[in-house]
Amino acid sequence: YRPENAFEKSVLTRLEKIPTDIYESVEEGANYIACEIAQTIREKQKAGRFCVLALPGGNSPSHVYSELIRMHKEEGLSFRNVIVFNMYEYYPLTADAINSNFNALKEMLLDHVDIDKQNIFTPDGTIAKDTIFEYCRLYEQRIESFGGIDIALLGIGRVGNIAFNEPGSRLNSTTRLILLDNASRNEASKIFGTIENTPISSITMGVSTILGAKKVYLLAWGENKAAMIKECVEGPISDTIPASYLQTHNNAHVAIDLSASMNLTRIQRPWLVTSCEWNDKLIRSAIVWLCQLTGKPILKLTNKDYNENGLSELLALFGSAYNVNIKIFNDLQHTITGWPGGKPNADDTYRPERAKPYPKRVVIFSPHPDDDVISMGGTLRRLVEQKHEVHVAYETSGNIAVGDEEVVRFMHFINGFNQL
């Protein structure tokens, strides 16, 4: 994922339509972007000019903001010449709303640096509906009055949105009021507590406004962003994935961690873009992919299938499709067992789990209550039936997954039921 030179990078990334850098961790990627922003701020300071930033709330940029705060406190990075435009705001909001995107932006960055409050601009989620059109037009004019945006920092939503430009947004769209779809509202409900309390719309910078920035950085961390990153970076430009519009920008960059990169061709199917150092895991991955692509079982794959789909290296390595097929078939067959904790008093040479010790003490880590029984209930049952000592470690209590209103309603039901 880290090419050693420009030639190797050009080979590995030839299917990627936006320059994309993959980092080992969120912190590493965020620190790089923070340094890029800091460098632009300092260059503008030396020239005696403002640096205009378009910034979002949300989780994706939070590590970038933390690094900028550190640089401000420890390295003297000043924000006195910085203009900040909030990218979007929920609508409608009450005047005392604490869940606004602007409040989140202040808590994550603005309250911790020396930026002049007069240099901070945000859409107003409390304005009257009949004034929104004119308000959005003036917001665009204000951006233009400062010479446009120098850096736009973006996250990518679950439906491929940038800011709140939902699927269907046009390339020439500007700041406007937009209805939020169910996916965006469900995501925002984590902030507002329940879907009922979540605003139904947002005032957002448009696609054209964002693409007008001199530099654009798109951040994505975690495997839940992997599918959208692939569509954005390698897919066609489409209004169904508004982030794909970044392919038209001549200075857009994508920064992602390894988890978010897992669907990119150079990570998921590297044999399509370069020669590979083949190991058992990569070979299995390639053969399973080839089966899915051709619709054939492993033992039916032919030399032609391998040659036509970028896997001729395996034919050279093993001599024929038959030899590869047999090896991978046997490898996969040996991962299937009715004894997940190991079969006692049996030859475990080709079994996925060793026979001894028996019984075993087993710890199963479950990201959330119920994930264990939903995803591997049969395995759990077998482990218990085969006399192993089984423990489940839940990595979260799951209490915030249920809204307060649901809890209260259920408590009323229980109280009423007990009185019957």
Put a short name on every predicted segment.
Residues 4-17, 77-151, 277:
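Ligand-binding beta-strand-loop-alpha-helix segment within the catalytic cores
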Residues 163-207:
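Class I SAM-dependent methyltransferase SAM-binding "motif I" and its flanking Rossmann-like core
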Residues 310-420:
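Active-site rim/loop-helix segments in enzyme catalytic domains that contact anionic ligands
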Residues 1-52, 347-351, 356:
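N-terminal glycine-/serine-/threonine-rich phosphate-binding loop
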Residues 43-74:
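Glycine-rich N-terminal segment of FAD-binding domains in flavoprotein oxidoreductases
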Residues 7, 208, 214-314:
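ATP/nucleoside-binding phosphotransfer catalytic cores, i.e., glycine-rich phosphate-binding loops
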Residues 55-60, 154-158, 221:
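Glycine-rich beta-strand-to-loop/alpha-helix junction loops that act as flexible
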